[in-house]
């Protein structure tokens, strides 16, 4: 496997949450009195996904990027972690580090996790940067995802053969058909065994198919809270050749945040940060320079916990 470590030049840090070690990076300039960028990844990625943005931005901004439990360099618990658990863990990290004036930067599942945490701690949030994500109950589940949820066969494919992570290396891109071997190795490195792929399969299982599912209820709570964040500056960058988070998802954010700055990249895919880095970085840099850190913090906290313990799916 190609050597990916030189692409990830960051010191590893850990916090203990419920007896498990959660990995994160915390890169900051000498004068770290300004904004904090909180990078929240999705599935099946990890903080490696943000490496180029952090290298480019850490000289001016504090950059914090955790790996969810079950992902990246964090511990891989044996039990299923639901969306509300990941929100709990991210909220604990935010409070442990006392992060304030946060600019949330999120993609895929990271949008629901990050916004779920920020709705619990709205006084800490200043701005939002979102890439191809959702924070509401899904109107559809793509067939590629449904196939991974077939009993027994889905788990064998995702957790056994690592097909979900391997397929992502190609199916999340549109401008190129193949990642550099070292980059591909970096994405796959933490997911090298059945046990280490529990979290990847757990995220697939936790996609809700109907209102009885506890994560559907969590997403509904997050969706109900999104209008409360409309006074925060927001940047939405979307790769339109994404078979998972379709343009409808972008439209749903624009509906609740009509002031949002939105960029549609017609020939970029789901991993828009990986597919179009030369466009994404300038959008972010300009947004950070031209928006206000002191946005209104009038929103009240929203309870984004699940109300359906014991659901077995």
Where are these regions (language model features)?
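A short, glycine- and basic residue-enriched loop/turn
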Residues: 47, 112, 268-269
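Flexible "cap/lid" subdomain of the alpha/beta-hydrolase fold that forms the substrate-access gate
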Residues: 1-13, 20-24, 28-30, 36, ...
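N-terminal regions of proteins, emphasizing targeting and processing segments when present
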Residues: 58, 284, 303-306
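Catalytic histidine-centered segment of alpha/beta-hydrolase-like enzymes
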Residues: 268-277, 281
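Histidine-centered active-site/metal-ligand motif
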Residues: 23, 41, 270
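Alpha/beta-hydrolase-fold serine-hydrolase catalytic core, especially in secreted/extracellular enzymes
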Residues: 291-306, 311-313
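Conserved HGGG/HGGXW glycine-rich cap/lid loop of the alpha/beta-hydrolase fold
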Residues: 27-73
